[in-house]
Amino acid sequence: MRDRKYYEIRETKVPAMIIELLSHQNFTDMKYGLDPAFRFNVARAAYKGVLRFLARRYNTQYAVQPLPVRRFGIHALGKSRYSLSWAPTPDPLEPSAFSKYYIVQERIEGGAFRDIAVVNEPAYELAVADERIHSYRILAGNDGGLSFPSEVLALRDNGSGIPQVNIVNGFTRISAPDTFEEGDFSGFNYSSDAGVPDVADIISTGVQTDYRRQSDYINDDAPGYGASRGNVEKTITAGNTHDFVYLHGDALRAAGYGFVSESSEAFASDVTLKPIGSAANPPVVDLILGKQKEILPGTGTKGTRYKAFPEALRQRIEAYCNQGGSLLVSGAYIATDLLDNPHSDELTRSADRSFATDVLGFDWQLGKGTVDGKVSMVPSPFKPFGWQERFSFTVSPTPDSYAVESPDAIRPSTPTGATIMRYDENGLSAGVAYTRPIATSTSRYADSRVVSMGFPFETIRGAKARNRLMADIMHFLLPHR
């Protein structure tokens, strides 16, 4: 730190500050600079600094705006009534950032969000009198302002008041691209994983082309180590919109099903074993995992984040399936994160393997199953999946959908499972259906059923393909439920 009389802030007529951050744009700098979570933390720190300075200058009280709420969930109460619940997120660095009230916002179908309620407690009840998709998000507020919106959850009432599906959003990751460091070479591995923007981003010029640490700057045409392409300058790249429940729900609505939704944190924290098929515990869970995977952000000093199946979620899913609940899980790293995870210790690796093979019914085959994103349904012992139609999913970044650079190839782990789809490029198994007998006498169902996809459902191109696939998956998961 240097204490100097900098002209830029000494002569201004308004409060000002100078921030020197990421000024060298070296490899370590850019590990943070390309991370949306880090950029949010920096922006919030600057906001806090300006706020405190002004409060002290004018001898007044201040409050920092709250962080977005967490543990958001929508649950059916029966007779077309629903409850929304959530939890405030404390800021450990700022006691004034607590929530004093909450704004509940609603969106009907593909319209715009509007305020429908202001409440003082983290809960709200409502009635739905139609069969449209109703989406909700929460804003926390205090004297300092409003938080960023929560993730977007949704519901659809099909007239019975008892939803058949609980859509669980486990895709929370926002991050920089994959990195590697091997001898004299290091950089960002966009072909492995180009990262996940927060909603959307415009920060990248293109993939890195020069990985040699000793490569010197010669001129602007040969800038040396870290040089990158310029083909995506000014291009908006889609990321984690935190709004994929609607897309899954739209496919369920097309098949005639009602649904509720909740965050994976809310789902994992509910350890009460409510009867499967009741309004409070739908018989099918649709788990969205997107590009969720365990990563080591920045220089790794703060540990890992974004594990696809953390212990609490793993245990909750196992308990749910042991009751006779059925599961659809889709994501690019559902097998890699469990069975080929470099961040797992031996104990975690053993528990993850048992969960994947015994509960979900698949084994890891390859971490980059395809590069063209083309998939075909194939014949299997399970009747709903006999059609041999082809579809594709997004493998290159676009303004409309995030890219899946490394989809998993997965194979059945038991004789009661079967491959139901394959990648056209090489014939590797892309999806597995699985039936598992229920041993407990308390279950009203004879088996638990699981469909696992090695790529995210929401990245499938075209509503027609998504609707057809979802209808057949639900026909398999709900034959007698």
Predicted feature residues:
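Aromatic-Pro/Gly-enriched surface loop or interdomain linker
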Residues: V152-P283, F457, A471, H475-R481
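Beta-strand-rich modules
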Residues: E125-L146
